[in-house]
Regions:
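Short beta-strands within extracellular/lumenal beta-sheet-rich domains
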Residues: 11-23, 134-135
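Extended extracellular/luminal ectodomain segments enriched in beta-structured repeat modules
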Residues: 24-33, 44, 146
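Short, surface-exposed beta-strand/loop patches at domain edges
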Residues: 143-148, 154-226
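Aromatic- and Gly/Pro-enriched, solvent-exposed loop/edge beta-strand patches characteristic
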Residues: 38-181
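Short, charged juxtamembrane terminal tails flanking transmembrane helices
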Residues: 250-253
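A sequence-level detector for low-complexity, Ser/Thr- and acidic-rich stretches
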Residues: 13, 33, 39-41
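A short, hydrophobic C-terminal helix/tail in secreted or cell-surface proteins
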Residues: 229-247
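Boundary/junction segments of secreted and surface-exposed precursor proteins
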Residues: 1-7, 64
Length: 253
């Protein structure tokens, strides 16, 4: 599975795809990696990273959602962000060669309710592109308190016909991925476009569908250091979880 994720740009509406991670203490996030497919001429413009908390944080709970559920989704609005255009993020790319996936969520493939039949489409089918690993350095680190978050990377492809598609990873997490700490659940990947916002859809449960519906994680890692809390004499233990160690190539779904 691969899901589109891009900032808005000339002739292209915004699409966001997110997967979750947990911090058990105040943490400075200094870098990240993620992997996806580039289509078109694979020329990268802006790279943006957003952090969301879990609904109902940062959300309007009085409105009626236009999706089957908001439980365990990202919030309505982002908690924090960094982007290369603002100079608080820089990045390098590594070309991993051509790759294909059996299913995808492409621009125009995200639909809200009424339900049924929307939003279930079964996905938008197979996709081939240049597999690229992104190494991102946050020149202004994210300083995040203990909480459950979603990581949302977006890549602008300057070719009008091109896009970035974030690759999936197994769910439940398998080695060398980092398991979630006790008391926290590994949530599945979610996505939305600017027409669906502020709502989100589950990539597997809502868009692909089926009985049972598949669930997906995404390929990413985060690097950070614990930050002393005020009046604390020792560093808190850092638990950076999610797909923190998933950096190897695999046969994608």
């Amino acid at each position: 599975m691969a899901t589109a994720s891009r900032p808005s740009s000339a002739g292209k509406f915004e699409i966001e795809s997110g997967d979750d991670f947990v911090l058990t203490g105040l943490t400075s996030i200094t870098s990240a990696t993620f992997t996806g497919l580039l289509t078109g001429n694979a020329s990268v413009g802006e790279v943006r990273v957003e952090i969301y908390r879990v609904f109902p944080n940062d959300s309007d709970t009085m409105r009626t959602p236009n999706v089957p559920t908001r439980a365990n989704s990202p919030s309505d609005v982002e908690f924090d962000d960094r982007d290369s255009a603002s100079g608080n993020l820089n990045f390098m790319t590594s070309d991993l060669g051509m790759s294909s996936v059996l299913n995808s969520v492409q621009p125009g493939g995200i639909h809200g309710c009424p339900c049924p039949p929307a939003p279930t489409t079964g996905g938008d089918g197979s996709l081939t592109g240049e597999e690229v690993a992104f190494d991102v350095n946050f020149t202004t680190p994210f300083v995040l308190p203990a909480d459950h978050y979603f990581f949302v990377p977006q890549v602008e492809v300057t070719d009008p016909a091109g896009n970035f598609f974030w690759l999936s990873a197994p769910r439940p997490i398998v080695p060398p991925g980092t398991p979630f700490p006790m008391g926290f659940t590994d949530l599945q990947s979610w996505t939305r476009d600017e027409m669906l916002a502020p709502d989100w859809l589950r990539v597997g449960g809502d868009i692909v569908g089926g009985s049972p519906a598949p669930t997906f994680n995404a390929v990413f890692s985060l690097t950070g250091t614990p930050v002393p809390e005020p009046a604390s004499l020792s560093l808190l233990a850092l638990a950076l979880t999610g797909l923190g160690a998933v950096r190897v190539r695999r046969r994608h779904r």
